Structure formats: C-alpha cells, structure tokens
Amino acid sequence: EGTYVAASESGHHSRPDLNAIQHAMSWWDRVEAIFEPDEWVPVFEQVTTKPVDIEGGVSVDGLSMESTMEFQLRVPPERTPDEVRELSDAELEIGTVNWTESIPPVMTNPRTELARVFRAAIRAGGGDPRLLRKTGTSDMNVFATEWNCEMVSYGPGDSSLDHTPNEHLPLNAFDNAIDVLIDVCERCGVDDAATSADGETTPDTEAAQ
C-alpha cells in the first residue's frame, strides 16, 4: 500500500500546464502500464493495481493545487515488494509516494500433512475440498514470516462474494466449518480443541468466505 502526494502552482484552469490532480492520474496510468494484465498469465502470478481513494483541489491558502491518492499493489510470490516499489517510484515525475509496511506474498505446499488432514476432514463432513491460490491477504501472510510451521488458509462459503454487498455465509455452512475444524484438531491430536471448562462448545473461528 502507498499514498501518492503532489502539489502544483495554482492558476486558471484554462492553462495548459498539468496540475497536481493530472500528475496523479498520469503517474497512475504509467504504473498500470508497467503491470498491465496479461490474459495468458494467471492473476495470482501478476501484480494487480488498485486505486482506493483520491482527493484533490485548491489548497486552503489558495496558492497551490494538491492531490492525494491511496492505492494498493498486490505482489505475487515471484516478485518482491521492494522490486514493485522501485518500478513504481521510477515513474514519478512530480510528487512523492509514501509507502506503508508491506505484507509479503505467501504460497505454501498443498502436500503437507496439515493440508492432507484438512482435505480428509472436509470430505468426512460431506464437502469437496478445492485448492485455491488466494489473491487476497490473510493472517497467514503475517504468521508465515514468524512461525516455522505448516499453515493452511481455510474458509467456507462462496469466495466470489467477498467484500460485496451480498457477502454472506449460510448458517449450515458455518456449522459444518466448525465441525471440520474440530475434526482437524482431533486428527492432529489436539485434545479438547473446542471445549470450554463447562463442557460447552466454544470454537474461536472466523466465518471467512
């Protein structure tokens, strides 16, 4: 993630010079051109670009035109955040980019013992496990750099509904996901994985799509 910031001298809108807002748009066009989507390459293996907020206009003192644009660049495992930042910064003509701390891409081996246990538990619950290369970030992106252990990102529901107005999870799918997680813990030898002191089932799960 990053924030592009630029300023230009204020003047009549009929002037041919580019103002700060136009500089922001021009820079973003060049960044998108660098990482132009390739229909022959899976989305997971490409850098994806997305502006998420833009503001601009005459400054409070009226002496300059200002623009601020927040954006996100998703980095595939084959590239590094530093490489993507360097390429984006190279396209700057006016303005600066303030980068936030990057979240590194992660891709795990689907043939680990933990992945096998998850597939078995899903099938035991009547489900059909599918291996996906998730394009969005999850907690695993952070934990993978700190924990030296096998990891799996699992969630029930229709992932195409993520972050949409119709995002939802049927209650039966939620209940089944809890059963899957309990089964996984039992297969991994975790005792009382989802049982509190009074015997009530209290799973700590996130109903993620």
PLM regions: where:
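Metal-dependent amide/peptide-bond hydrolase catalytic core
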Residues: 1-209
